[in-house]
């Protein structure tokens, strides 16, 4: 049975600690592929929410010192209850965010990390020409992804012109780049949510990471052709394509 079929059959519940820029897009993409999104900003309800969830997705895009305890507790509970824990380390190469991720990593174990080449280079202790959340350079060299996977003991997804998925021993590649991913803020957040959804129903997180990245990228290519020179329509077309593809699966 394919991962998409499992998602349709089980309708996994995905708990998100989202940033406050793109929560609607994150919730939509989870719902459109047949799962159920759940958001929270309340630490008191975390234990019960993690208990009923099938995966936990954490995005540090708008994290602060005051919200750090919420993130730490969500991650700790995900580990304790053996729920897949996915990290989107938005702009982790900025010092404050770097300190946050270092502190989290000392306390919890992430199962999958999804970031652009600059973010993944940080986990590999390497420098990158990229800035912030934008991917500016080619990333076809798998060195950073493999090294980051080895250092963290985590499946790494490095998105860019060619997406690289590494477990530290082998790599898989997805060549489905679209310029519209970059200019539509939140597409990376959406991909991370899709990865979390695939991980929720799979015992093989390396394969789940690859299949999720490929599924999302191929939908992006179709959506790019559909909207042509109307990039503002891209996300809606992307969601429609993901929905249609999901519901063609029996």
From Swiss-Prot:
Keyword Nucleotide-binding on entry: yes
Function of the molecule: Catalyzes the phosphorylation of the hydroxyl group of 4-methyl-5-beta-hydroxyethylthiazole (THZ).
Reactions catalysed according to its record: 5-(2-hydroxyethyl)-4-methylthiazole + ATP = 4-methyl-5-(2-phosphooxyethyl)-thiazole + ADP + H(+)
Protein name: Hydroxyethylthiazole kinase
Source species: Lactococcus lactis subsp. cremoris (strain MG1363)
Organism lineage: Bacteria, Bacillati, Bacillota, Bacilli, Lactobacillales
Family statement: Belongs to the Thz kinase family.
Pathway annotation: Cofactor biosynthesis; thiamine diphosphate biosynthesis; 4-methyl-5-(2-phosphoethyl)-thiazole from 5-(2-hydroxyethyl)-4-methylthiazole: step 1/1
Cofactor entry: Mg(2+)
Binding site for substrate: 39, 186
Keyword Kinase: yes
């Amino acid at each position: 049975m394919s991962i998409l079929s499992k998602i349709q059959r089980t309708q996994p519940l995905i708990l998100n600690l989202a940033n406050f820029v793109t929560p609607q897009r994150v919730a939509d993409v989870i719902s459109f592929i047949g799962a159920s999104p759940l958001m929270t900003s309340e630490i008191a309800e975390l234990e019960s929410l993690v208990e009923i969830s099938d995966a936990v997705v954490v995005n540090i895009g708008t994290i602060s010192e005051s919200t750090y305890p919420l993130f730490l507790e969500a991650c700790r509970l995900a580990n304790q209850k053996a729920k897949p824990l996915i990290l989107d380390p938005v702009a982790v190469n900025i010092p404050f965010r770097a300190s946050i991720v270092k502190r989290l990593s000392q306390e919890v174990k992430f199962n999958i990390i999804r970031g652009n080449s600059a973010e993944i280079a940080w986990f590999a202790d390497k420098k990158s020409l990229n800035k912030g959340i934008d991917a500016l350079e080619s990333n076809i060299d798998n060195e950073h992804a493999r090294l980051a996977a080895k250092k963290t003991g985590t499946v790494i997804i490095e998105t860019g012109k060619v997406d690289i998925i590494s477990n530290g021993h082998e790599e898989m590649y997805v060549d489905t780049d679209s310029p519209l991913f970059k200019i539509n803020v939140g597409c990376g957040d959406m991909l991370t949510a899709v990865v979390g959804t695939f991980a929720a129903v799979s015992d093989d997180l390396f394969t789940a990471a690859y299949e999720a990245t490929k599924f999302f990228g191929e939908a992006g290519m179709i959506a790019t052709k559909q909207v042509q020179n109307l990039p503002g329509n891209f996300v809606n077309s992307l969601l429609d394509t993901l929905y249609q593809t999901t519901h063609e699966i029996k």
